């Protein structure tokens, strides 16, 4: 019985540790106002992050391209509504956000 509780506790702890970075990146997206136009799984004003991840899967320049778009904004890729620039996001935060987004396939 103690072994079962120990194993169960270990699995729960491992799950929480694995979820922590994802939650931290979601929090960063919220703090950076990204969630005003994007959601993880549904189109809002801009594309869902899952759609972005699918579109850029296998693109070796995706991290660089999307990190630049987070900072400078962009237009024409997902329709007529432009993505505004977000100068308040630091370059390392943009990279962190994009790595997270690309992991959401």
Where are these predicted regions, by residue range?
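Bacterial N-terminal signal peptides that target proteins for export
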Residues: 1-10
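N-terminal signal peptide c-region/cleavage motif recognized by signal peptidases
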Residues: 19-21
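Sequence/structural segment immediately N-terminal to covalent heme-attachment motifs in c-type
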Residues: 23-40
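Conserved helix-turn-beta segment immediately C-terminal to the redox Cys motif
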Residues: 28, 55-60
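Domain-level signature for proteins that mediate thiol-based redox and metal-cofactor handling
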Residues: 35, 59, 63-64
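Axial heme c-ligation environment in periplasmic c-type cytochrome domains
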Residues: 36, 45-56, 69-98
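Short hydrophobic/aromatic patches at helix-to-coil boundaries
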Residues: 101-105
């Amino acid at each position: 019985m103690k072994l079962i509780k120990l194993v169960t506790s270990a699995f729960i702890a491992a799950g929480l540790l694995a979820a922590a970075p994802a939650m931290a990146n979601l929090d960063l997206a919220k703090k950076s106002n990204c969630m005003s136009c994007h959601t993880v799984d549904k189109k809002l004003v801009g594309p869902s992050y899952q759609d972005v991840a699918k579109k850029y899967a296998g693109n070796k320049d995706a991290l660089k391209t999307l990190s630049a778009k987070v900072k400078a904004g962009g237009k024409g890729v997902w329709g007529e509504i432009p993505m505004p620039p977000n100068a308040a996001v630091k370059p390392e935060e943009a990279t962190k956000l994009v790595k997270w987004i690309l992991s959401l396939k």
